[in-house]
């Protein structure tokens, strides 16, 4: 079987320097050139970090930040800021990604102002999923997507909420 699999591109062999022919023996047949040492060491460091911090602790932190954002977005919805939460309103069964829409306001403009005035990066639009947005009735404008990770802080989450409130009230 190995003899039937031919790489599309080839170059230096890594083990037989005087020829450009791909070796027939393993693992050299599929491992020409220099290994991606920065990638290997980066992966090693990331795995050690995950082991030290713990996936459960990462999940708890992301869940806490997302819950804080959801609570405050629901408060803004009730306040009449013309902001609508996309997807589930509760934390149960959802990840650390939250989409909001702003009927009557261009989501691209809101995302631009979040970046320009507050340094908050979001993803805006259809998120490569136009059919999903048609199902959610957010097509063609899309939504503003926030995502929270382990290295975010409560202060950053509250700044995002405050920024949305200020932008939508002006």
Task: Report the location of each language-model feature.
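Pyridoxal 5′-phosphate
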Residues: 1-170
């Amino acid at each position: 079987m190995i003899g039937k699999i031919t790489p599309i591109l080839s170059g230096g062999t890594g083990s037989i320097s005087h020829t450009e022919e791909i070796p027939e023996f393993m693992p050299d047949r599929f491992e020409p050139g220099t290994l991606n040492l920065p990638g290997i060491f980066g992966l090693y460091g990331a795995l050690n970090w995950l082991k030290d911090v713990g996936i459960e602790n990462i999940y708890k932190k992301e869940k806490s930040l997302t819950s804080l954002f959801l609570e405050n977005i629901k408060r803004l919805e009730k306040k009449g800021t013309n902001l609508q939460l996309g997807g589930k309103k509760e934390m149960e069964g959802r990840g650390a990604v939250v989409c909001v829409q702003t009927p009557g306001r261009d989501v691209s403009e809101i995302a631009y102002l979040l970046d320009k005035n507050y340094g908050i990066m979001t993803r805006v639009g259809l998120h490569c999923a136009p059919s999903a947005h048609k199902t959610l009735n957010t097509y063609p404008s899309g939504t503003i997507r926030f995502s929270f990770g382990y290295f975010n802080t409560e202060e950053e989450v509250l700044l995002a909420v405050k920024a949305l409130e200020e932008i939508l009230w002006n």
